[in-house]
């Protein structure tokens, strides 16, 4: 099979607000979240620790949308695998608008991290003959041990910009 490229996004971040769950006319769920990711670095000129936060719009479809809507909330830490998509439309004034989103549908993954009871729930949206069995399996599977939060949050790397090889 010839490959035309790879479109895969992996993020770990925190929800900025509660999920927004909607249903399409055919009854399938669509859930939108905003996810914050941050990086920190030491300013080489003055030694100050700097931080930059990026906000990402994530869109879940079908069973993952239902699971995200039920289990995620503002402040939840989550691992996301999806694909990048940019949409274009014209607003009420005829001006072209663009939005870039991470789409989590077939082949995507969501894993809840950092819960209070040190457990996580993993949900994948793979190709399945019976999506109902998939969702029952995901919701009834044993909860997995979550990542060590200190490893995930230790983004304070001590290096100068000149050390970067590019």
UniProtKB/Swiss-Prot annotation:
The gene is ssb. It comes from Buchnera aphidicola subsp. Baizongia pistaciae (strain Bp). GO terms for molecular function: single-stranded DNA binding. This is Single-stranded DNA-binding protein. One of its GO terms (biological process) is DNA recombination. A motif (Important for interaction with partner proteins) lies at residues 161-166. PROSITE patterns: SSB. One of its GO terms (cellular component) is nucleoid. Residues 143-166 are annotated as: Disordered. The lineage of its organism: Bacteria, Pseudomonadati, Pseudomonadota, Gammaproteobacteria, Enterobacterales. Residues 6-111 form the SSB domain. Keywords: DNA damage, DNA recombination, DNA repair, DNA replication, DNA-binding. Homotetramer. Plays an important role in DNA replication, recombination and repair. Binds to ssDNA and to an array of partner proteins to recruit them to their sites of action during DNA metabolism.
């Amino acid at each position: 099979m010839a490959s035309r490229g790879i479109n895969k996004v992996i993020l770990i971040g925190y929800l900025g607000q509660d999920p927004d769950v909607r249903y399409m006319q055919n009854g399938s769920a669509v859930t939108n979240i905003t996810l914050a990711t941050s990086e920190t670095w030491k300013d080489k000129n003055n030694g100050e620790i700097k931080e930059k936060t990026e906000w990402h719009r994530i869109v879940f479809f079908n069973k993952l949308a239902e699971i995200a809507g039920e289990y995620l909330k503002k402040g939840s830490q989550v691992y996301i695998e999806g694909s990048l998509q940019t949409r274009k439309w014209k607003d009420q004034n005829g001006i072209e608008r663009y939005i870039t989103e991470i789409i989590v549908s077939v082949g995507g993954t969501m894993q809840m991290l950092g819960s209070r009871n040190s457990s996580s729930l993993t949900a994948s949206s793979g190709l399945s003959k019976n999506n109902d069995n998939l969702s029952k399996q995901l919701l009834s599977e044993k909860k997995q041990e979550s990542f060590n939060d200190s490893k995930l949050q230790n983004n304070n790397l001590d290096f100068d910009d000149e050390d970067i090889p590019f």
